[in-house]
């Protein structure tokens, strides 16, 4: 509903709004503050306000609580209570659905935490976990995504090293994964509104308390640079092969099998290729063409012309692209073209003689 009056005097309010960063990678809490203003205007005594948005430790109690008090005129911890239960969802994942992921909950008091565990437990078949306190639950969520970001940054860095050594990073990782405790992360572009953003929240809070988060920020620098690295590597390969374009980019969304374009790093590859003087067409049947135009000034093509492209780039492993045959891919290229595979989805595919290959 858009009618604030229709949500008056509810027992529990769940706030799950975006938590982006600004152009300087500083946390932008304006959506959270706006939500507090809305909820505060209808908040009644005894209500619980639960936040699910990813934030740094302290936001719920130190920022949201006072914001709710200011608007409602009620006293936090007496008239109303706070809770935190981080959103855990993996877009496009049909196996690890919301109900199958353990739900972390925390409350301002043990009684509030138990009420939230009971509420979420009614729909989460995997069960709930009551965290020690709200700040602990906030911290748990933000390090989940920061850890993943750092692990991907490591394999991205070694992929860059292996590129210079003429070794396939995917072949190296395949061999390394035969050891039981090797972590199976893959190199690639790190975008979206979670993994590429949330580490900045933890880094921001770390700086506020006087700690320099070197590893976290190093991981962000590496991952943010991958678009340019990929673009230059592909452009160099084309130049060495005497190929001048045009280029077809397959996929624009931030990850496979979702339509979400927010913070996609494929756009960095497109920009890098254009900076090298190459014409680039982008195809993504899952993405909304109007959003692509609005967000990135890109006009998605709806139909791929056979025999047009000197280079085909598999950027996002949507099922439609991952299951393409060698014949389908070759049909789109000019003779002797380059097949570039950012995510390794075609690495086992055999191509006709004379075609160039590149993979991250």
Which residues does each predicted region cover?
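Structural/interface elements that position substrates and couple domains in central-metabolism enzymes
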Residues: 1-360
